[in-house]
Amino acid sequence: MAAATLLRATPLFSGLGAGPAPLLQGLLRPLKAQALPVLCRGLAVEAKKTYVRDKPHVNVGTIGHVDHGKTTLTAAITKILAEGGGAKFKKYEEIDNAPEERARGITINAAHVEYSTAARHYAHTDCPGHADYVKNMITGTAPLDGCILVVAANDGPMPQTREHLLLARQIGVEHVVVYVNKADAVQDSEMVELVELEIRELLTEFGYKGEETPIIVGSALCALEQRDPELGLKSVQKLLDAVDTYIPVPTRDLEKPFLLPVESVYSIPGRGTVVTGTLERGILKKGDECEFLGHSKNIRTVVTGIEMFHKSLDRAEAGDNLGALVRGLKREDLRRGLVMAKPGSIQPHQKVEAQVYILTKEEGGRHKPFVSHFMPVMFSLTWDMACRIILPPGKELAMPGEDLKLTLILRQPMILEKGQRFTLRDGNRTIGTGLVTDTPAMTEEDKNIKWS
């Protein structure tokens, strides 16, 4: 089981060096002008500010069950830091900025904001908690260096709390800080202590250091409304201190050619087409040639501008959450799931060999084994693609809890390379997590596989 433990605990892109990479493609709503993310709205006009890299950059995000207060906490953080010039205050309504999100009172797609503490610069992703949008949440958590798990004191851990922790663990998010929210709604201190105990047990169950994990009790709403400083302001300050100290600054791979999995594509009037995402590795400079690969596309162009949170950059580094303006392309030419890379540095593959851990029922996986030619969906980077699983010769069944070498054949060639991690899902269930070990050529037999 040592290999199984490795697959469950190793950072997602150990072979690529840039830390976790986006895994599960979201169910994108039709894009509207008012729904442009905070990240790239500034590209609609010439940026007036230049991003100054004077502090370590870290990607964090809020995860947790629906309506436990993730977006309220995100807004409270920006409000408190804005008073010292470390952020621009973002109201709840600005973070949940799509009409259907405001109408339902839940976050559907991950939203990005930025802020700075005395020690660090943060890109913060507010991840959706509703069960229907778990795939969107994972697109948000995948580039994260650490998470803030939000749990309501009056509810305790709930179904999406478990699922978010499981998925975050599978994709290599190794450091979690906990904020027990809505403490103002609970009169009994023993109930809060029980919730904390339950959270520590849950963290330990999913492979985190439950006894060492910082847990801060407070109320994001009190902080936002500037009342009860002990539960409000001071709790958020304690949380930020814990994030600064407990979540380490990751080592970025700046030596390899740049690789940007495309998260979203936007058409900016008067400027052109912008792709957004988190730079997985390397350095991207204004004026660099690039190519878009995947989904049967191979398009070459030039990066004419780079911005991060309304500020222009001459160069972006691995870990930066950015928008890149590209020359001569229309929005319909590009799509989520493509990869923007240095020309010639990477190529799509349709067949891979991989070491795969099959999740048990207790881990949220399948109840039953599967056979050769079983067809789940593979998620890696920002793409997902149907694939056929071929079991090793002499192996008739793949059992939950097994760690084994499999061959996977994709419906279309996608960006895959040695060391790349992926997740397998069947319906709304994560059934396995794997690591690519080789990318062999397709045989004639492989090419004749039926997909209907």
Swiss-Prot record:
Residues 105-109 are annotated as: G2. Residues 1-43 form a transit peptide. The modification N6-acetyllysine is found at residues 79, 88, 256, 361, 418. Pfam families: GTP_EFTU (PF00009), GTP_EFTU_D2 (PF03144), GTP_EFTU_D3 (PF03143). PROSITE patterns: G_TR_1 (PS00301), G_TR_2 (PS51722). Belongs to the TRAFAC class translation factor GTPase superfamily. Classic translation factor GTPase family. EF-Tu/EF-1A subfamily. GTP hydrolase that promotes the GTP-dependent binding of aminoacyl-tRNA to the A-site of ribosomes during protein biosynthesis. Also plays a role in the regulation of autophagy and innate immunity. Recruits ATG5-ATG12 and NLRX1 at mitochondria and serves as a checkpoint of the RIGI-MAVS pathway. In turn, inhibits RLR-mediated type I interferon while promoting autophagy. This is Elongation factor Tu, mitochondrial. It comes from Bos taurus. The gene is TUFM.
